[in-house]
Amino acid sequence: MSKLNMTPREIVAYLDEYIIGQKEAKKSIAIAFRNRYRRLQLEKSLQEEITPKNILMIGSTGVGKTEIARRIAKIMELPFVKVEASKYTEVGFVGRDVESMVRDLVNNSVLLVENEHKEKLKDKIEEAVIEKIAKKLLPPLPNGVSEEKKQEYANSLLKMQQRIAQGELDSREIEIEVRKKSIEIDSNVPPEILRVQENLIKVFHKEQDKVKKTLSVKEAKEALKAEISDTLLDSEAIKMEGLKRAESSGVIFIDEIDKIAVSSKEGSRQDPSKEGVQRDLLPIVEGSVVNTKYGSIKTEHILFIAAGAFHLSKPSDLIPELQGRFPLRVELENLTEEIMYMILTQTKTSIIKQYQALLKVEGVEIAFEDDAIKELAKLSYNANQKSEDIGARRLHTTIEKVLEDISFEAEDYSGQNVTITKELVQSKLEDLVADENLVKYIL
């Protein structure tokens, strides 16, 4: 299957492997992502005129809002960042400003491009690493040796490289020069402060950027890989491509958008900080220029997907200007008992398959009877009804509770086949689910 030019039908088919139901949401998102590809096939003048139709996803937690957007961005290899609206404060207050989400997107985009370039140069990087280690292991030739000696040395070097590549010398120790660990820079500060931080680091680390270390050949391979990658990669080209890709095909997923909506119950927009964040967000969604450490980026062609449960507020509680910037609205369905069962049995990497794989590491073969899976779905659904509805996330905690003893005593079950029955599920969970006061402990 192709990636960037996947059709909406192909996108939905891919999502169906991981997410059950939510047909309307999948369809809307698939069309929005396909339109990104369509726009890039047009003439430059027309490309500038076409802006993405931002999406507002409405649905309870755990119904698949984030997963739908994340899965598509991953398969199509698009710059993607997920942020929470409630983490931001308006300009002038202590906290993260909304422009930092664009800076995070650019950081992710540059990293994505860098990894692609590393993958293309993978063989070349490995060859350079192996050659450098081989030359460390073999003593250098003295000056003025004969051609015959030079040929012998070249043959020895080649054999040494082959042995290093095959891992035969992984345990041998060598002394190499490696770069000192760089100081972490906070990328969420304004670009002006970021540049000051970078300049200070350059000044203090100019002369002391390398140290000698004794490492095993295996460790040296990893240490030298990053260093040689930097020398072979064109960092400026990567930065420019990362900026361009973030600008033309970036996706920002804003979760918990309902947390910055001012509910009418709270009294006619009396929370200035929430409304302030909305007003700060507005120019970014509409289209503005944001300065990052890699350069300036225009935001009008970034696709924004906002999501929220809207239990205590309504989409209409957002300021009208922001509502207008999310013209496509999709309501996601709450999960039924049947959908819970399908999530456990039909998804490509279902929770059951994950736990089976984890316990197989300990030599324990876990099998679930169909009645046991149905009981898990039923009890998880009932827990959601009696307590907070956390959607599919409830399945993680119910299965964890059922398998708790087996996971803890895994070495006692090593080499055995363990079958999870309906009765076992009931004995582990039914008392808790039946008691409404204890439901809250099955998070």
Swiss-Prot record:
GO terms for cellular component: HslUV protease complex. One of its GO terms (biological process) is protein unfolding. ATP binds at I20, G62, V63, G64, K65, T66, E67, D255, E321, R393. It comes from the Bacteria. The keyword Zinc-finger does not apply. ATPase subunit of a proteasome-like degradation complex; this subunit has chaperone activity. The binding of ATP and its subsequent hydrolysis by HslU are essential for unfolding of protein substrates subsequently hydrolyzed by HslV. HslU recognizes the N-terminal part of its protein substrates and unfolds these before they are guided to HslV for hydrolysis. HAMAP family: HslU (MF_00249). This is ATP-dependent protease ATPase subunit HslU. It comes from Helicobacter pylori (strain ATCC 700392 / 26695). The lineage of its organism: Bacteria, Pseudomonadati, Campylobacterota, Epsilonproteobacteria, Campylobacterales.
